[in-house]
């Protein structure tokens, strides 16, 4: 039986100057997605995807590494200006925003909190007893 050749797709580099960085900081993980202005994903990263496991995924350092990884991937597509949209109550949200601002060659245009707030909607989960 003949072996199949594995064909790897080439990354098509797009020239996109402006984009939006979505930071979703949950209690367990931090996910970062870089999109163009229309909302099409260019690059993404997460703390768990970088090898952080268990409770280490929710640390501020893991969030910083996830942001740097996603923005380095996005820089290959020519991103120079980004807006930041932050969602969630996680511990990595402040560090993630700071590390976007500290990235060389990337200018931050706006910062917006898009955390959904319930107006007496669903009942929240019960309190933890440790």
Swiss-Prot record:
SUPFAM superfamilies per UniProt: Translational machinery components
Keyword Repeat among record annotations: no
Any one cellular-component term (Gene Ontology): ribonucleoprotein complex
Domain of life: Bacteria
Entries under Gene3D superfamilies matching the protein: Ribosomal protein S11
GO-annotated biological processes: translation
Keywords: Ribonucleoprotein, Ribosomal protein, RNA-binding, rRNA-binding
Pfam families, sorted: Ribosomal_S11
GO molecular function: rRNA binding; structural constituent of ribosome
Listed NCBIfam families: PRK05309.1, uS11_bact
Function summary: Located on the platform of the 30S subunit, it bridges several disparate RNA helices of the 16S rRNA. Forms part of the Shine-Dalgarno cleft in the 70S ribosome.
Family that this chain belongs to: Belongs to the universal ribosomal protein uS11 family.
Assembly: Part of the 30S ribosomal subunit. Interacts with proteins S7 and S18. Binds to IF-3.
PANTHER family reported in the protein's UniProt record: 40S RIBOSOMAL PROTEIN S14/30S RIBOSOMAL PROTEIN S11
Protein name: Small ribosomal subunit protein uS11
Source organism (scientific name): Campylobacter lari (strain RM2100 / D67 / ATCC BAA-1060)
